[in-house]
Amino acid sequence: MLFDQIASNKRKTWILLLVFFLLLALVGYAVGYLFIRSGLGGLVIALIIGFIYALSMIFQSTEIVMSMNGAREVDEQTAPDLYHVVEDMALVAQIPMPRVFIIDDPALNAFATGSNPQNAAVAATSGLLAIMNREELEAVMGHEVSHIRNYDIRISTIAVALASAITMLSSMAGRMMWWGGAGRRRSDDDRDGNGLEIIMLVVSLLAIVLAPLAATLVQLAISRQREFLADASSVELTRNPQGMINALDKLDNSKPMSRHVDDASSALYINDPKKGGGFQKLFYTHPPISERIERLKQM
């Protein structure tokens, strides 16, 4: 059951990434069709933009991410309990020892960052260290180490980059339509009098309008799948599903973080640091903790 869940989550993530690339290609084709008379040309430009966005975000410095979240680096002497747990989990996962940071915040939370295991780092809040017992801390750090081992940060970064590229292209198309670019193209098409041209025009406009929302939803779906995968992978490392369940239960009852957390960093944390309600739940980067616990109970 454990390995079935891991395989299923990986498969769903790759399907969602494929959908992402198709969305980017669709928007690029639509913009190219409407404004440069070449759908293929627009598609190529869109893929190049997405690639550049992804590269620039993947190589973002770990120091920048940690600084944005108010984290300070610790070592074996200054935080031995946390350091040794991370060391144990990294050893079991067969990855290099990540750098270790602490965030001074009473809320219970943790995250990992780094585009690959060689430059990875993990961070935990002081509140997490004060409340979690050894088994629960192992489960949380197993979750974060699993993100590193599974290259989740890189995958999530690619998803954010593709979503940003799609939004940028759609916004650019909107401004061009505002200044009359689409109107000139439409006039040319009307003179051609081709029904297929009209259909293509409508489809292109719909793609430009709806793609940013679709991209956001796909990005969130990828983030949720990686959380499920990291939970299951943590159990694989610790061989202790109850430890993960108990940790998640405590995380669920934790208050939001006291410091401001930007949207990009929010997706990194094991527990949504903002904990909004109502309509905001549709755009959560994390699946409900109750659902995560239920999946663990099924193992």
Curated annotation (Swiss-Prot):
Topology in the lipid bilayer is annotated as: Multi-pass membrane protein
Per the Swiss-Prot or TrEMBL record, the active site comprises 144
Query: What residues bind Zn(2+), as annotated?
Result: 143, 147, 227
Q: Which Pfam families match?
A: Peptidase_M48
- Assigned EC number: 3.4.24.-
| GO function term, MF aspect, one | metalloendopeptidase activity
Q: Belongs to which family?
A: Belongs to the peptidase M48B family.
Name recorded for this polypeptide: Protease HtpX homolog
